[in-house]
């Protein structure tokens, strides 16, 4: 879905960060990010879907599915500017807010326009669009993603007002990984997760195999997490239910019955699902990063030797450690 092209697809990258400096190796990734612009990461060709705010919500979500994208910038033709993003989180919020039962159609999803939903959703807390210039550094992009607790950052040309690209944690880490072998390896890359304390290890939001989808949606809304480990009666992870899985309800037009279990809702991908991507506290940060990038996933579930969930390590956690804190716990 969010594959990043090979290094050949990117504009030529200047390796000025390789010059000898007195800085410690622990800051090489920070220096790299500060010396490269968002423009450097934009592939020569990529798909971008834009929605007008007058579009029906339902049509917009179907369009996300059809185009294989997870989010789209919103264009307000009255204001002649981009005003926000429509994401799978919006789909989850609408379903959770308006679902009554399998027998009652969700009128708001079927009939509302995007602008109507935004008026309802943002009435208590107007949030201006968080975006970035193509000339801003990747360090600024990572800082903005983490500071604003967002997963998508539109790159908007300040002169034309056009959206050029959508930056994500995954794309930034993949870009860094393309050049990572050229750096002297920082000391913290050889340290374990346990030593570095990267990730979340308290109050992990989880669901059981029998948990209804509607309850899972409520946990997404309340905890603002992007995935929920699915555990058995002994707390062992057997699956994972992510926000991206929820959009399948639109693909299959099954969003009118949210009383089914998450296990049943996940059956659609059983033929290609390779299992939950896991890691252990004793594994090094380097191993974790390689696994995340190669598997193209957004997080790993930290487990013990019995597969009991101990924590979650997300791309956001990794980028914060690599770029903002130099391997130190923030």
UniProtKB/Swiss-Prot annotation:
- Residues the record lists as Phosphothreonine modifications: 263
What the entry lists under PROSITE patterns is as follows: CBS
Residue ranges of domain CBS in the record? 43-103, 125-187, 198-260, 272-329
Q: Which residues bind AMP 3?
A: 151, 200, 205, 226-227, 298, 314-317
Q: Which domain of life is it from?
A: Eukaryota
CDD domains, sorted: CBS_euAMPK_gamma-like_repeat1, CBS_euAMPK_gamma-like_repeat2
Provide the binding site for ADP 2. 70, 170, 242-245, 269, 277, 298-299
Residues annotated as carrying Phosphoserine in the record are 261, 270
Q: Which parts of this chain are annotated as the region Disordered?
A: 1-24
Per UniProt, AMP 1 binds at 85-90, 130, 151-152
Q: Where is this motif: AMPK pseudosubstrate?
A: 138-159
One GO MF term attached to the UniProt entry: ATP binding
| UniProt: ADP 1 binding residues | 85-90, 130, 151-152
Q: Report one GO cellular component.
A: cytosol
Extract the SMART domains matched here: CBS
* Residues that coordinate or bind ATP 1: 70, 85-90, 130, 151-152
Q: Pfam families, from UniProt?
A: CBS
Alphabetically, which GO biological process terms does the record hold? cellular response to glucose starvation; fatty acid biosynthetic process; positive regulation of gluconeogenesis; regulation of carbon utilization; regulation of glycolytic process
What do we know about how this protein assembles, alone or with others? AMPK is a heterotrimer of an alpha catalytic subunit (PRKAA1 or PRKAA2), a beta (PRKAB1 or PRKAB2) and a gamma non-catalytic subunits (PRKAG1, PRKAG2 or PRKAG3). Interacts with FNIP1 and FNIP2.
Per the entry, what this protein does is:
AMP/ATP-binding subunit of AMP-activated protein kinase (AMPK), an energy sensor protein kinase that plays a key role in regulating cellular energy metabolism. In response to reduction of intracellular ATP levels, AMPK activates energy-producing pathways and inhibits energy-consuming processes: inhibits protein, carbohydrate and lipid biosynthesis, as well as cell growth and proliferation. AMPK acts via direct phosphorylation of metabolic enzymes, and by longer-term effects via phosphorylation of transcription regulators.
The protein's name is 5'-AMP-activated protein kinase subunit gamma-1
Q: Which organism is it from?
A: Bos taurus
- Top-level taxonomy: Eukaryota, Metazoa, Chordata, Craniata, Vertebrata
């Amino acid at each position: 879905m969010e594959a990043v092209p090979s290094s050949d697809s990117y504009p030529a990258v200047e390796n000025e960060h390789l010059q000898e400096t007195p800085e410690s190796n622990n800051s090489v990734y920070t220096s790299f990010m500060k010396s490269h612009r968002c423009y450097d990461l934009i592939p020569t060709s990529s798909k971008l879907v834009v929605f007008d705010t007058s579009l029906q919500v339902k049509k917009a979500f179907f369009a996300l599915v059809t185009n294989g994208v997870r989010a789209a910038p919103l264009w307000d033709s009255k204001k002649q500017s981009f005003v926000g993003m429509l994401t799978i989180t919006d789909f989850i919020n609408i379903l959770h807010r308006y679902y009554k039962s399998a027998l009652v159609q969700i009128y708001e999803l079927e009939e509302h326009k995007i602008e109507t939903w935004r008026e309802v959703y943002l009435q208590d807390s107007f949030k201006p669009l968080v975006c970035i210039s193509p000339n801003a550094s990747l360090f600024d992009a990572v800082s903005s993603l983490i500071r604003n607790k967002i997963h998508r950052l539109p790159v908007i040309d300040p002169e034309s007002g056009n959206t050029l690209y959508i930056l994500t944690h995954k794309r930034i880490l993949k870009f860094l990984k393309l050049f990572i072998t050229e750096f002297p390896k920082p000391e913290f890359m050889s340290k374990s997760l346990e030593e570095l304390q990267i990730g979340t290890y308290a109050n992990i939001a989880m669901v059981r195999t029998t948990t209804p989808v509607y309850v899972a949606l409520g946990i997404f809304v309340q905890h603002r997490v992007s995935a929920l480990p699915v555990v058995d009666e002994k707390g062992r992870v057997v699956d994972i239910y992510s926000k991206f899985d929820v959009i399948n309800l639109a693909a299959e037009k099954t969003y009118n019955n949210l009383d089914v279990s998450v296990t049943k809702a996940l059956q659609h991908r059983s033929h290609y699902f390779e299992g939950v991507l896991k890691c252990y506290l004793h594994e090094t940060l380097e191993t974790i990063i390689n696994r995340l990038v190669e598997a193209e996933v957004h997080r790993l579930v930290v487990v013990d030797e019995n597969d009991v969930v101990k924590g979650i390590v997300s791309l956001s956690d990794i980028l914060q450690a690599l770029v903002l804190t130099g391997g130190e716990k923030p």
